[in-house]
Swiss-Prot record:
GO terms for cellular component: extracellular region. This is Probable endopolygalacturonase B. The active site is at D203 (proton donor), H225. Involved in maceration and soft-rotting of plant tissue. Hydrolyzes the 1,4-alpha glycosidic bonds of de-esterified pectate in the smooth region of the plant cell wall. The lineage of its organism: Eukaryota, Fungi, Dikarya, Ascomycota, Pezizomycotina. Residues 21-29 form a propeptide. GO terms for molecular function: polygalacturonase activity. Glycans are attached at N138, N338. It catalyses: (1,4-alpha-D-galacturonosyl)n+m + H2O = (1,4-alpha-D-galacturonosyl)n + (1,4-alpha-D-galacturonosyl)m. It is found in: Secreted. It comes from Neosartorya fischeri (strain ATCC 1020 / DSM 3700 / CBS 544.65 / FGSC A1164 / JCM 1740 / NRRL 181 / WB 181) (Aspergillus fischerianus). Residues 1-20 form the signal peptide.
Length: 364
């Protein structure tokens, strides 16, 4: 039997002592344990607490947590695994309002991404499933998930009022062949908080492509491409506003604190703050702002269609490797304005001779 509704049993036992509750109330209180995706699909609508016990998701299927009843709690218990197939995914999808997703002690979500890794990520080779779609997961919380070896792209976030706390994404086994393993991609979202994330990966630890009122704090990012705004431009939504990245470490990564916008595009990046961010072992740029991205690559020729204003870099400190560049700022004419630059110190690398249109107060 794939699931059990414990509250219905309790309600039956207590019938002689209390008046019977309406059926709708019983359904709302029901607690269900599922051991298969088929049982989850057919039974989730009647459950207010869902426990996923040692789920083995069949190849080519999504663990479907969409359309959950308002206020549902989902608990990952034991080890969650996924069958192998070349497809786009996602491996997990969740939506709903006032949802809590968490994990029991000792639990883990093991994607076994090595089966897909070929060094090409999403740019060719095997078709790789994305990990977790958090679209329309509103006024909700994701707490304490431990995730291992995603094939490509981690959490895709398009939600409002979503808090993600104390999540581990450990793709350290993909150092050689893992690629495009972004941890958190945020787009068209408002009031997103990511607190206490620990990430070992091979791409952006955080990438905010659009959205407002976004906080990333107390993070640890190792091995990837750093904490990024962008690239901004060329999408339906090209506005980033009020983003705070604070009290975080970026270790052994390609970049540290980064803002990048698309060549020839329009949009805006405003109210972004990098505060108390420490760097170590950065291999390309410690602090970087570039307005020259075309087809995903820098051109060296910045444009000014995306305004980058009211930006704060405060106490971004640490070291890069000797072959890296401490700070690189490449702005379009007049597009980078009203920056606050305070207490930043990036050392160990080269000084750039290619900076352009550096705003007043900043240094390059």
């Amino acid at each position: 039997m794939h699931f059990f509704q414990s509250s219905l049993v309790a309600a039956t036992m207590g019938a002689a002592l209390v008046a019977a509750a309406p059926a709708a109330d019983l359904e709302t209180r029901s607690s269900c344990t599922f051991t298969s995706t088929s049982a989850l699909k057919s039974g989730k609508a009647s459950c207010s607490t869902i426990t996923l016990h040692n789920i083995a998701v069949p190849a080519g299927e999504t663990l479907d947590l969409t359309g959950l009843k308002t206020g549902t709690t989902v608990v990952f218990d034991g080890t969650t695994t996924f069958g192998y197939k070349e497809w786009e995914g996602p491996l997990i999808s969740a939506s709903g309002t006032s949802i809590t997703i968490k994990q029991n002690p000792g639990g883990k979500i093991d994607c076994d991404g090595a089966r897909w890794w070929d060094g090409k990520g999403g740019n060719g080779g095997k078709k790789k499933p994305k990990f977790f779609s958090a679209h329309k997961l509103n006024k909700s919380n994701i707490n304490g998930l431990k995730v291992y070896n995603i094939p490509v792209h981690g959490f895709s976030i398009q939600s409002d009022h979503l808090t993600i706390k104390d999540v581990l994404i450990d793709n350290s086994a993909g150092t050689k062949l893992g690629h495009n393993t972004d941890a958190f991609d945020v787009g068209s979202s408002t009031y997103i908080t990511i607190d206490g994330a620990t990430v070992y990966n091979q791409d952006d630890c955080l990438a905010v492509n659009s959205g407002e009122h976004i906080t990333f704090t107390n993070g640890y990012c190792n091995g990837g491409h750093g904490l990024s705004i962008g690239s901004v431009g060329g999408r339906k939504n090209n506005v980033v506003n009020d983003v705070t990245i604070s009290n975080s470490q970026i270790i052994n990564s390609q970049n540290g604190a980064r803002i990048k916008t698309v060549y020839g595009a329009t949009g805006s990046v405003t109210g972004v703050k990098f505060q108390d961010v420490s760097l170590k072992g950065i291999t390309k740029y410690g602090i970087v702002v570039q307005q020259d991205y075309e087809n995903g690559k820098p051109t060296g020729n910045p444009t000014n269609g995306v305004k980058v204003s009211d930006i704060t870099f405060e106490k971004v400190t640490g070291s890069v490797t000797s072959s890296a560049t401490d700070i690189y700022i490449l702005c379009g004419s007049g597009s980078c304005t009203n920056w606050t630059w305070s207490g930043n110190s990036v050392t160990g690398g080269k000084k750039s001779s290619k900076c352009k249109n550096v705003p007043a107060g900043a240094s390059c």
